């Protein structure tokens, strides 16, 4: 059977763990009128209760659902049957019949661990015996538990014997069909836990010593600082299961102690175990659809953090233009950006959604590739309907639904129309080189989720200053960057006083053309006007960061810094190179290209007190992933039919591996040529750059260059050695991945969606796709 690899999680440690008080006797517990309590057995003179959480849409007479029963922890000595109530409620809401079961413990009945195991098996047997009445599939019953309860659960699926001879349905199997184990006690050897309590029954009662190919699929959660269950024990258990051909998942949470999965210890870990339990059961085919983060949010004792989010996106800033990313060949000083990077996490393999402006901005706000719309190549020019349809959810609409105030200060570049304020007539670009003062905007940012907008449409219209839905003045373009700095700082100061979380999107005007550094920045770099403009841009970033810090909200604010694509040819790239500055660092190409220089971008995140400083991530991420990442951060569900190309990389913020949510990442050049990145392989459906760097496509065809390019990005980051002819199988696989992702309307996990157009051309360099 297929198995998963071990994932290790780095999360903030707490050094105490929750215990649950022992009671003097076993009594019926009240969970509410929606929970049914029944006695599943009587032992040691006490009635043992099992509590059923029923799916709302479940008809037991005709519907057979999978079931799960949870056993509390407490060292076989005590514990509360309420420990896993929220997990039971969650899984019932997701469609399973969920139970929490009481069982005998030393403090109440004076019984040893063997009695706990007997009761666990009796509970599973009781559920299977009554499966028809309860509407349960008798072949899909999971046992779950934490600590000693994890031992009980594991024993029901792995250990033979230990059945209560007084069970009324002794002929019915007590074996669980899946195991959900939270820091379980599953090694009872002399070097394990509890050997002194189970000496006579060892090794038969020790799950780790009884693994066979018949064992059920298992998921285990463990903290790396667990003093009772060593990580080595968990790894050995996982390896033994996999070697036996049993499907196994192990998640180790770095720095976490025993009991870490309880919300009172680590809300983040608690949430994560909900999600991964759901995904595990989904893998087994017991659940359908994605985890319900909104329900998890409702079940939490305390609301999850709602940090302010400041997203700063430069325009045409190259990867190598940030000095800390290009220490050898970066000649432009960027102290503020470097400081931001040092204070948080650097993503070294981050990409824009496209190698050019408009598509990247569309992808950021919608979580969807722009080529799924009417715009198949190039950029928009304004004076036309907004590229984001009114019904499509955006990051801004989603955040606003969660109580955020939202603002954009800067460049929109996603089209909107202008109306004459007197007549309501739509204005045409041919008659208005610059939108007139007073022109109204019916479909701008304030109609796509933003409460406030101050900025401009794109560089050619930069003189027209817009606030909310109106052109308010004309101003010289040299003043735009200082204006955006002033407006952003003012917004942060005002929003910080409201005590309401805010999302501020700052798509800067620089260092895109027109390259217009302010007078005090002219000549500062000693390199070129472009370099001066980059230095001024760095200063603006510093002003925004200072505003956050001076308002005392750095602990509650996630700052993201990036660029929309690589550096433009307008920077005079060759002249800068002659002076020792490489705008793309070690990468080939620049803005508009399929090569890395076109779309590999600086990407930093700072969240003081949450993201560790001086850290980095080599996960392959994309600006388009921000929608899913923000939704994940806020424990909220991505709206239906939204963010089809967005995959959360939230675990990376904590130093954790990011689970695969897609086969690969799709790249696109200014001319619409496609590329596909999967692991360290990158396929380009172009003979040349696909953009502005030589050889362009027509010249590459004349030179009879191969129709495809395949690079090993890890071994050849400069994309100098085309391996397509040597690895045709890999090129073909990546091509099929790309083809599938295009036609199914999404590149991430989930149901197929619809593209806005049926005319997406996979191959842009001829009438038919050449054979691989």
Where are these regions (language model features)?
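Short beta-strand/loop motif that positions the catalytic acidic residue
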Residues: 220-222, 226
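Alpha/beta-hydrolase active-site loop
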Residues: 111-132, 275, 387-393
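Formylglycine-dependent sulfatase
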Residues: 116, 227, 235, 244, ...
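Primarily recognizes the serine-hydrolase "nucleophile elbow" in alpha/beta-hydrolase
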Residues: 122-198, 202-203, 207, 434-435, ...
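N-terminal cap/lid segment of alpha/beta-hydrolase-fold proteins
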Residues: 25-62
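Short beta-strand element of the alpha/beta-hydrolase
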Residues: 63-74, 310
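Short amphipathic alpha-helix adjacent to the substrate-entry channel of hydrolases
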Residues: 81-100, 332-341
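Catalytic histidine neighborhood in serine/cysteine hydrolases
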Residues: 242-259, 455
